[in-house]
């Protein structure tokens, strides 16, 4: 599979409010298969979420997991296959608008009967431990093939999540999770900070089998998540979990060649990199003062100077940019 991640700015047309912005940074992580993609990947994605959030020093978060095949299958049992998309988008608003308003939309906008709306609300209200929710879902099994497939996949994801070392207090089977975008086809996720419910989801995603089909005539099933970094860092900053001592410079050291031939400087930079440090090599033929001005702008902690004398002696000069010591 093709495994990729990126961090970039994204834009969304929504009302700006606490923790929600129209322009923000987002991290995307995806695994794309060629023709098929094993269910194991649908557990690895939330396992990555767990490790990232624990790495940030967060513990009070919950990865809520569901499978859209279960929802589609259940709606089919009620004779509502043609309205499943509208129903899912409505159910996805449950946390924001509450059960009463969801029921009203199901009745007035989706055209459901009272019995159908009540049946859906009872279904998504199934709660308990992961084992208890899965056991309750077994009571619906055998009536719809898609439902049964989704239940089988959800069971596999929960088993594999435990194998990845994700504790149950950090993930929960939650039948209210639907994701409003129609391209999701299987497992779906939403991650919330339990001590900041007003922020909403800070990380979400799911399985998408047919998304590439909008662009190319080839099956490229995938699964992925997006982390709202700006929203998340807003909370981390409030809680004092952002470490200002972490390096902000793009490199640990800047190597400044002081000769016309860069060969020795290139070799030195590679040697330092092999030791696990981040190194930037200055390649412009400029005056020493301009080179040091660049180093100051870069805010690197160390500058490595390599001139003719250093090359001849097999040494280099290192300047501590904070103290000025060399």
Language-model region placement:
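Positively charged, Gly/Ser-enriched RNA/tRNA-binding surfaces
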Residues: 1-59, 105-326
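Juxtamembrane helix-loop transition sites at the ends of transmembrane segments
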Residues: 49, 78, 85, 100, ...
């Amino acid at each position: 599979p093709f495994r990729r991640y990126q961090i970039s700015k994204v834009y969304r047309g929504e009302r700006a409010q606490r923790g929600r912005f129209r322009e923000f940074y987002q991290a995307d992580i995806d695994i794309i298969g060629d023709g098929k993609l094993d269910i194991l990947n649908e557990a690895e994605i939330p396992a990555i979420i767990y490790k990232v959030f624990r790495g940030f020093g967060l513990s009070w978060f919950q990865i809520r997991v569901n499978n859209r095949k279960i929802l589609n299958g259940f709606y089919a049992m009620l004779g509502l296959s043609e309205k499943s998309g509208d129903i899912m988008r409505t159910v996805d608003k449950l946390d924001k608008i509450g059960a009463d308003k969801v029921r009203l939309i199901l009745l007035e906008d989706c055209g459901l009967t009272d019995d159908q709306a009540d049946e859906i609300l009872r279904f998504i209200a199934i709660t308990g431990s992961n084992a208890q929710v899965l056991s309750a879902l077994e009571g619906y099994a055998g009536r719809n093939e898609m439902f049964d497939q989704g239940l089988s996949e959800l069971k596999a994801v929960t088993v594999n999540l435990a194998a990845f070392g994700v504790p149950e207090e950090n993930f929960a089977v939650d039948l209210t999770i639907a994701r409003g975008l129609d391209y999701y086809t299987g497992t779906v996720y939403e991650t919330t900070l339990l001590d900041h419910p007003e922020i909403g989801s800070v990380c979400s995603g799911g399985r998408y089998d047919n998304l590439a089909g909008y662009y190319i005539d080839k099956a490229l099933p995938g699964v992925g998540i997006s982390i709202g970094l700006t929203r998340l860092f807003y909370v981390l900053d409030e809680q004092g979990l952002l470490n200002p001592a972490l390096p902000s410079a793009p490199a640990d050291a800047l190597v400044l060649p002081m000769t016309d031939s860069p060969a020795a400087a290139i070799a030195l930079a590679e040697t330092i990199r092999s030791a696990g440090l981040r190194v930037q090599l200055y390649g412009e033929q400029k005056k020493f003062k301009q080179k040091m001005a660049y180093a100051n702008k870069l805010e690197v902690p160390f500058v490595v100077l390599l001139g003719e004398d250093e090359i001849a002696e097999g040494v280099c000069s290192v300047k501590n940019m904070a103290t000025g010591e060399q």
